[in-house]
Regions:
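Short structural boundary motif marking the start of a folded domain
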Residues: 2-8
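NAD(P)H dinucleotide-binding glycine-rich loop of Rossmann-like/cofactor-binding domains
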Residues: 89-155
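Glycine-rich beta-strand-centered segment in the early N-terminal region that forms part
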Residues: 25-41, 53-95, 124
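Residue-level recognition of beta-strand termini and adjacent short loop/turns
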Residues: 13-15, 28
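Conserved hydrophobic/aromatic beta-strand scaffold that supports enzyme active sites
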Residues: 19-24, 71-73, 88, 110-112, ...
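A short acidic, Gly/Pro-enriched loop at the edge of an enzyme's catalytic core
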Residues: 30, 199-204
Length: 204
């Protein structure tokens, strides 16, 4: 039974994207209805889903609604929940669409998410809140290599590379070197060095 109609980004099939109406079921007793303000776009996973190049895994199919980096505000929440309506949250996707696969379902105006998967955010973060998932990935990577010490070299200066470099400075107080081939990703004025690999003065 349809609980709510909303607007969503939908990959109808490989190579075909539409923005159209989608149907949500009613939230379960442990779920919240969230109104989205922003949703990040993954240039890896979601691009592969759009082009049809994503390796098969259980649940993959079309049509699908992408999005696992959503920031919005709670509209409805369970009785007694600390996430009251109006609370700004990060959501790693949606579980509630009935006419498209939720992979991962966050790129829609309204989404349904289990309460325990929502992370409250300061309102002032705004659209920058969508970086939470990538920041968590970077932090997890740094924690996994703690026994070996902080990274001296980071390869790639995309969003994840930038987060790794900045978190290395914050957590370890050390300055990493970053290799990046694309000149557009080597801006001036950073507090760490970004080189084309062949221009790095270190050769060890």
């Amino acid at each position: 039974m349809t609980y709510k109609k909303t607007t969503a980004v939908i990959f109808e099939k490989p190579g075909k994207l539409e923005v159209r109406e989608a149907s949500l079921r009613a939230p379960a007793a442990n779920e919240c209805l969230v109104e989205s303000d922003w949703s990040g776009i993954s240039t890896g996973t979601e691009r592969l889903m759009l082009t049809g190049e994503m390796p098969s895994f259980p649940g993959l199919g079309y049509p699908l609604i992408p999005g696992y980096e959503t920031v919005g505000k709670v509209v409805e929440s369970p009785d007694g929940s600390e996430l009251r309506p109006g609370t700004h949250v990060f959501a790693p996707g949606s579980v509630g669409f009935t006419d498209a696969r939720n992979l991962f379902g966050g790129s829609a105006r309204h989404i349904i998410c289990p309460e325990d998967r929502l992370i409250p955010l300061p309102k002032k973060l705004g659209s920058e809140g969508v970086l939470l998932a990538l920041a968590a990935t970077a932090l997890h990577a740094l924690r996994r290599c703690e026994q070996k010490g902080p990274p001296e070299l980071i390869i790639g200066h995309g969003v994840l590379g930038q987060l790794l470099a900045r978190l290395t400075r914050i957590i370890h107080g050390t300055i990493p070197t970053v290799w990046e081939r694309d000149p557009a990703r080597r801006p001036a004025g950073l507090d760490y060095a970004v080189y084309d690999a062949c221009q790095d003065p270190r050769h060890d």
